[in-house]
């Protein structure tokens, strides 16, 4: 394990594996650097890249601050980019894709950007979280009701059936990993605030994101995720959409398929 110090003094933990161009992995909600899917993906990509797999603040071995702002998480990613040599390829998953996107828009030196199913809700098709979603997640965590927060985030935020959460509760290894990072769910909710209301993305919203960008979706994914991916690819000035079966993230990451597509994108001319 390595650490880097973010702008506000918070220690950010990361693992570094492989040799080659620098690639930073930005996890989504419920995930962290030791999450099995993250570990597998980092291992597969290490054949081609120096992979930096880090714990977002508040997770795993990373520190945290008394109060959260999106800007602090953006500074964490910038610290990782600096640690990786000042520029890097970046892959972000779900809320991590939104974090990577916001950091890119703020001027980070990202050579190429892969945005994997950012949960943007751009119309009324499919699932849409309730209007008080962000507030309710924070209330549950403030009351230390982690189990309820997990269920609420998954069912109301992600649209998962209640029985799926019930099954996870009786899987000790799975549930313990979720409980360990549940207190950071308000961070993910804050990142998504304003992007899950069913409204079209404003034109030129992310015009500053000029690097080559790959927006990834699985054809098996929920319609709201797919529509969001299509809208984002059309909104960014230098992006293309990759749509294939097996690239979804709502069940289990197919790390072999994903790593293959990421290697082709980051190492290719387009």
Regions found by a protein language model. Give the residues of each.
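Conserved HGGG/HGGXW glycine-rich cap/lid loop of the alpha/beta-hydrolase fold
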Residues: 3-63
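Conserved catalytic-core motifs of eukaryotic protein kinase domains, centered on the activation segment
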Residues: 35-37, 62-67, 125, 226-227
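Catalytic active-site module of serine/aspartate enzymes centered on a nucleophile-bearing elbow/loop
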Residues: 238-270
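Helix-rich cap/lid subdomain of alpha/beta-hydrolase
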Residues: 118, 122-175, 188-189
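Short beta-to-alpha linker loops that shape the active-site pocket of alpha/beta-hydrolase fold enzymes
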Residues: 55-59, 119, 245-248
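Conserved hydrolase catalytic core segment
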Residues: 87-124
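Conserved serine/cysteine hydrolase catalytic core
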Residues: 177-234, 243
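Active-site loop/oxyanion-hole signature of alpha/beta-hydrolase fold enzymes
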Residues: 43, 52-89, 260
């Amino acid at each position: 394990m390595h650490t880097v110090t973010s702008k506000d003094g918070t220690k950010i933990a990361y693992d570094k594996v492989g040799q080659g161009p620098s690639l930073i992995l930005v996890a989504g909600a419920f995930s962290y650097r030791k999450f099995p899917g993250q570990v597998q993906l980092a291992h597969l990509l290490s054949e081609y890249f120096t992979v930096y797999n880090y714990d977002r603040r508040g997770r795993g071995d990373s520190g945290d601050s008394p109060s959260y702002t999106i800007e602090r998480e953006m500074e964490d990613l910038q610290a990782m980019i600096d640690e990786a040599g000042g520029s890097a390829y970046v892959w972000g998953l779900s809320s991590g894709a939104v974090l990577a996107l916001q950091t890119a828009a703020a001027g980070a030196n990202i050579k190429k950007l892969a945005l994997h199913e950012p949960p943007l809700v751009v119309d009324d098709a499919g699932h849409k979280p309730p209007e008080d979603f962000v507030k309710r997640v924070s209330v549950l965590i403030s009351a230390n009701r982690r189990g309820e927060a997990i269920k609420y985030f998954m069912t109301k935020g992600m649209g998962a059936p209640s029985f799926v959460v019930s099954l996870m509760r009786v899987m000790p290894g799975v549930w313990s990993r979720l409980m360990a990072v549940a207190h950071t769910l308000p961070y993910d909710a804050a990142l998504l605030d304003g992007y899950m209301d069913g409204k079209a993305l404003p034109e030129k919203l992310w015009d500053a994101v000029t690097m080559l960008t790959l927006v990834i979706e699985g054809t098996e994914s929920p319609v709201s995720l797919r529509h969001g991916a299509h809208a984002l690819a059309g909104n960014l000035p230098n992006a293309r959409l990759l749509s294939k079966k097996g690239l979804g993230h709502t069940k289990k990451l197919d790390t072999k398929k994903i790593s293959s597509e990421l290697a082709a994108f980051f190492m290719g001319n387009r």
